[in-house]
Protein backbone atom coordinates (compact mmCIF):
# COMPACT_ATOMS: atom_id res chain seq x y z
CA UNK A 1 0.00 0.00 0.00
CA UNK A 2 1.05 3.59 -0.60
CA UNK A 3 1.82 5.33 2.71
CA UNK A 4 0.65 8.82 1.72
CA UNK A 5 -2.64 10.20 0.34
CA UNK A 6 -1.64 10.30 -3.34
CA UNK A 7 -3.71 7.20 -4.15
CA UNK A 8 -6.35 7.61 -1.47
CA UNK A 9 -6.60 6.97 2.26
CA UNK A 10 -3.47 5.28 3.70
CA UNK A 11 -3.87 1.85 5.30
CA UNK A 12 -2.44 3.04 8.62
CA UNK A 13 -5.05 5.78 8.96
CA UNK A 14 -7.82 3.39 7.90
CA UNK A 15 -6.78 1.00 10.69
CA UNK A 16 -6.66 3.89 13.16
CA UNK A 17 -10.24 4.92 12.38
CA UNK A 18 -11.51 1.33 12.42
CA UNK A 19 -9.93 0.86 15.85
CA UNK A 20 -11.62 4.05 17.06
CA UNK A 21 -14.99 2.65 16.00
CA UNK A 22 -14.28 -0.62 17.82
CA UNK A 23 -12.91 0.78 21.08
CA UNK A 24 -14.01 4.40 21.59
CA UNK A 25 -16.99 5.43 19.46
CA UNK A 26 -20.20 5.83 21.48
CA UNK A 27 -23.33 5.61 19.34
CA UNK A 28 -25.61 6.41 22.29
CA UNK A 29 -23.88 9.77 22.72
CA UNK A 30 -24.39 10.49 19.03
CA UNK A 31 -28.01 9.41 19.40
CA UNK A 32 -28.51 11.88 22.26
CA UNK A 33 -27.03 14.64 20.12
CA UNK A 34 -29.45 13.92 17.27
CA UNK A 35 -32.45 13.43 19.55
CA UNK A 36 -32.22 17.02 20.75
CA UNK A 37 -34.20 17.79 17.60
CA UNK A 38 -37.65 16.82 16.32
CA UNK A 39 -37.46 14.12 13.62
CA UNK A 40 -40.14 13.09 11.16
CA UNK A 41 -40.61 10.92 8.06
CA UNK A 42 -43.08 11.70 5.28
CA UNK A 43 -43.65 10.31 1.80
CA UNK A 44 -42.91 12.59 -1.14
CA UNK A 45 -43.51 11.25 -4.67
CA UNK A 46 -43.26 7.67 -3.46
CA UNK A 47 -40.07 8.05 -1.41
CA UNK A 48 -39.91 8.26 2.39
CA UNK A 49 -38.09 11.47 3.33
CA UNK A 50 -36.63 11.97 6.79
CA UNK A 51 -36.34 15.52 8.07
CA UNK A 52 -35.77 17.60 11.17
CA UNK A 53 -38.47 20.21 11.79
CA UNK A 54 -37.40 22.50 14.59
CA UNK A 55 -39.84 25.32 15.22
CA UNK A 56 -38.63 28.49 16.86
CA UNK A 57 -40.07 29.61 20.21
CA UNK A 58 -40.51 32.99 18.50
CA UNK A 59 -43.85 32.87 16.61
CA UNK A 60 -42.80 35.37 13.92
CA UNK A 61 -39.73 33.35 12.93
CA UNK A 62 -39.06 32.94 9.20
CA UNK A 63 -39.24 29.40 7.73
CA UNK A 64 -35.92 28.10 6.35
CA UNK A 65 -35.13 24.80 4.64
CA UNK A 66 -31.46 23.73 4.75
CA UNK A 67 -30.08 21.05 2.41
CA UNK A 68 -26.84 19.11 2.85
CA UNK A 69 -24.64 17.65 0.12
CA UNK A 70 -22.29 14.70 -0.45
CA UNK A 71 -20.59 13.23 1.43
CA UNK A 72 -22.73 14.71 4.16
CA UNK A 73 -25.92 14.57 6.16
CA UNK A 74 -28.13 16.57 8.48
CA UNK A 75 -25.49 16.00 11.18
CA UNK A 76 -23.62 18.92 9.59
CA UNK A 77 -26.26 21.27 10.99
CA UNK A 78 -26.41 20.17 14.62
CA UNK A 79 -24.39 23.18 15.82
CA UNK A 80 -26.50 25.81 14.01
CA UNK A 81 -30.09 24.60 14.43
CA UNK A 82 -30.46 25.92 17.98
CA UNK A 83 -28.87 29.35 17.31
CA UNK A 84 -31.07 29.72 14.22
CA UNK A 85 -34.30 28.77 15.97
CA UNK A 86 -33.60 30.56 19.23
CA UNK A 87 -31.08 33.35 18.61
CA UNK A 88 -31.94 35.18 21.84
CA UNK A 89 -30.43 32.27 23.79
CA UNK A 90 -27.14 32.84 21.96
CA UNK A 91 -26.87 36.62 22.20
CA UNK A 92 -28.91 37.36 19.07
CA UNK A 93 -32.24 39.05 18.46
CA UNK A 94 -35.75 37.66 18.08
CA UNK A 95 -36.08 39.19 14.61
CA UNK A 96 -33.32 36.86 13.38
CA UNK A 97 -35.16 33.64 14.33
CA UNK A 98 -36.02 30.83 11.89
CA UNK A 99 -38.29 27.81 11.86
CA UNK A 100 -35.74 25.28 10.56
CA UNK A 101 -36.38 22.28 8.30
CA UNK A 102 -33.45 19.97 7.47
CA UNK A 103 -34.39 17.09 5.12
CA UNK A 104 -32.14 14.15 4.32
CA UNK A 105 -31.65 13.88 0.57
CA UNK A 106 -33.17 10.75 -1.05
CA UNK A 107 -30.87 7.81 -0.37
CA UNK A 108 -29.10 9.56 2.50
CA UNK A 109 -29.36 8.91 6.24
CA UNK A 110 -32.83 7.85 7.29
CA UNK A 111 -34.49 8.81 4.00
CA UNK A 112 -35.65 6.10 1.63
CA UNK A 113 -33.85 5.12 -1.56
CA UNK A 114 -35.49 5.82 -4.93
CA UNK A 115 -36.08 2.61 -6.87
CA UNK A 116 -36.00 4.37 -10.24
CA UNK A 117 -34.05 7.18 -11.87
CA UNK A 118 -35.30 10.74 -12.06
CA UNK A 119 -34.57 12.02 -8.57
CA UNK A 120 -32.29 14.80 -9.75
CA UNK A 121 -31.94 18.37 -8.55
CA UNK A 122 -35.19 19.58 -10.09
CA UNK A 123 -37.34 16.80 -8.64
CA UNK A 124 -35.80 17.21 -5.20
CA UNK A 125 -36.40 20.98 -5.35
CA UNK A 126 -40.06 20.35 -6.19
CA UNK A 127 -40.33 17.82 -3.35
CA UNK A 128 -38.80 20.27 -0.88
CA UNK A 129 -41.34 22.91 -1.90
CA UNK A 130 -44.11 20.36 -1.37
CA UNK A 131 -42.68 19.53 2.06
CA UNK A 132 -42.59 23.17 3.16
CA UNK A 133 -46.16 23.78 1.99
CA UNK A 134 -47.31 20.63 3.81
CA UNK A 135 -45.72 22.02 6.97
CA UNK A 136 -47.77 25.19 6.55
CA UNK A 137 -45.05 27.41 5.11
CA UNK A 138 -46.36 29.23 2.03
CA UNK A 139 -43.36 31.58 2.08
CA UNK A 140 -39.88 30.45 3.00
CA UNK A 141 -36.14 30.77 2.44
CA UNK A 142 -33.68 28.06 1.37
CA UNK A 143 -30.02 27.42 2.13
CA UNK A 144 -27.59 24.75 0.96
CA UNK A 145 -24.05 23.69 0.15
CA UNK A 146 -22.60 21.21 -2.33
CA UNK A 147 -25.56 19.30 -3.86
CA UNK A 148 -27.68 21.26 -1.41
CA UNK A 149 -26.53 24.42 -3.19
CA UNK A 150 -27.72 23.03 -6.53
CA UNK A 151 -31.08 22.09 -5.01
CA UNK A 152 -31.35 25.50 -3.36
CA UNK A 153 -30.63 27.37 -6.58
CA UNK A 154 -33.28 25.32 -8.38
CA UNK A 155 -35.79 26.10 -5.64
CA UNK A 156 -35.03 29.79 -6.05
CA UNK A 157 -35.32 29.65 -9.85
CA UNK A 158 -38.42 27.57 -10.36
CA UNK A 159 -40.46 27.30 -7.18
CA UNK A 160 -42.93 30.04 -6.35
CA UNK A 161 -43.05 29.71 -2.56
CA UNK A 162 -39.34 30.44 -1.98
CA UNK A 163 -38.57 34.14 -1.56
CA UNK A 164 -34.83 34.06 -0.74
CA UNK A 165 -31.85 31.72 -1.03
CA UNK A 166 -28.32 31.48 0.36
CA UNK A 167 -25.64 29.04 -0.79
CA UNK A 168 -22.12 28.44 0.46
CA UNK A 169 -21.17 26.91 -2.90
CA UNK A 170 -22.42 29.27 -5.60
CA UNK A 171 -22.44 27.61 -9.01
CA UNK A 172 -21.80 29.51 -12.23
CA UNK A 173 -20.12 29.03 -15.60
CA UNK A 174 -17.16 31.24 -16.57
CA UNK A 175 -18.00 33.91 -19.13
CA UNK A 176 -16.30 33.77 -22.52
CA UNK A 177 -14.44 36.98 -21.66
CA UNK A 178 -13.04 35.53 -18.45
CA UNK A 179 -11.90 32.42 -20.33
CA UNK A 180 -10.10 34.52 -22.95
CA UNK A 181 -8.57 37.09 -20.58
CA UNK A 182 -8.51 35.56 -17.10
CA UNK A 183 -7.14 37.41 -14.10
CA UNK A 184 -4.59 35.67 -11.88
CA UNK A 185 -7.38 34.76 -9.47
CA UNK A 186 -9.49 33.35 -12.30
CA UNK A 187 -6.50 31.38 -13.63
CA UNK A 188 -6.09 29.80 -10.22
CA UNK A 189 -9.81 28.93 -10.12
CA UNK A 190 -9.70 27.39 -13.61
CA UNK A 191 -6.61 25.36 -12.67
CA UNK A 192 -8.49 24.10 -9.62
CA UNK A 193 -11.43 23.11 -11.80
CA UNK A 194 -9.13 21.25 -14.20
CA UNK A 195 -7.50 19.42 -11.30
CA UNK A 196 -10.90 18.39 -9.96
CA UNK A 197 -12.05 17.12 -13.35
CA UNK A 198 -8.88 15.12 -13.99
CA UNK A 199 -7.93 13.90 -10.51
CA UNK A 200 -10.74 14.40 -8.04
CA UNK A 201 -14.02 13.48 -9.73
CA UNK A 202 -13.75 9.73 -10.29
CA UNK A 203 -16.16 9.06 -7.42
CA UNK A 204 -18.80 11.20 -9.16
CA UNK A 205 -18.58 9.30 -12.44
CA UNK A 206 -19.03 5.98 -10.66
CA UNK A 207 -21.84 7.15 -8.38
CA UNK A 208 -23.78 8.86 -11.16
CA UNK A 209 -23.51 6.03 -13.69
CA UNK A 210 -23.22 2.68 -11.83
CA UNK A 211 -24.20 3.38 -8.21
CA UNK A 212 -25.64 -0.09 -7.61
CA UNK A 213 -22.39 -1.84 -8.50
CA UNK A 214 -20.45 0.32 -6.07
CA UNK A 215 -23.19 0.08 -3.47
CA UNK A 216 -22.67 -3.63 -2.75
CA UNK A 217 -19.15 -3.01 -1.47
CA UNK A 218 -20.05 0.09 0.52
CA UNK A 219 -23.07 -1.49 2.21
CA UNK A 220 -21.26 -4.77 2.91
CA UNK A 221 -18.18 -3.17 4.48
CA UNK A 222 -18.36 -0.36 7.07
CA UNK A 223 -14.62 0.20 6.63
CA UNK A 224 -15.10 0.43 2.86
CA UNK A 225 -17.84 3.01 3.34
CA UNK A 226 -15.65 4.95 5.76
CA UNK A 227 -12.65 4.93 3.42
CA UNK A 228 -14.79 6.09 0.47
CA UNK A 229 -16.02 9.10 2.45
CA UNK A 230 -13.13 10.06 4.74
CA UNK A 231 -10.82 10.56 1.76
CA UNK A 232 -13.13 13.35 0.62
CA UNK A 233 -13.17 14.88 4.09
CA UNK A 234 -9.37 14.92 3.97
CA UNK A 235 -9.31 16.37 0.45
CA UNK A 236 -12.08 18.95 0.68
CA UNK A 237 -12.15 20.11 4.30
CA UNK A 238 -10.03 22.92 5.72
CA UNK A 239 -8.54 20.49 8.24
CA UNK A 240 -4.74 20.73 7.76
CA UNK A 241 -4.67 17.11 6.65
CA UNK A 242 -6.50 15.80 9.73
CA UNK A 243 -10.20 15.06 9.05
CA UNK A 244 -10.85 14.51 12.76
CA UNK A 245 -10.27 18.26 13.23
Could you describe each region identified by the protein language model?
Residues 1-7:
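Short His/Asp/Glu-rich catalytic/ion-coordination signatures at enzyme active sites or charged loops
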Residues 2, 12-219, 224-226, 232-237:
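Catalytic cores of eukaryotic secretory-pathway lumenal/extracellular enzymes that build
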Residues 241-245:
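Short, intrinsically disordered, charge-balanced linker/junction segments flanking boundaries
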Amino acid sequence: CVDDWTQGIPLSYTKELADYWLTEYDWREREKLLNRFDHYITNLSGVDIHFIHQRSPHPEAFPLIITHGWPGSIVEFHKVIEPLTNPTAFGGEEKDAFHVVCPSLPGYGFSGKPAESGWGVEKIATAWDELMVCLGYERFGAQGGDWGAAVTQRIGQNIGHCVAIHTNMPIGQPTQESLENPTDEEKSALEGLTYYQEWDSGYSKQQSTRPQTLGYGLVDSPVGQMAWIIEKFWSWMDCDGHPEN
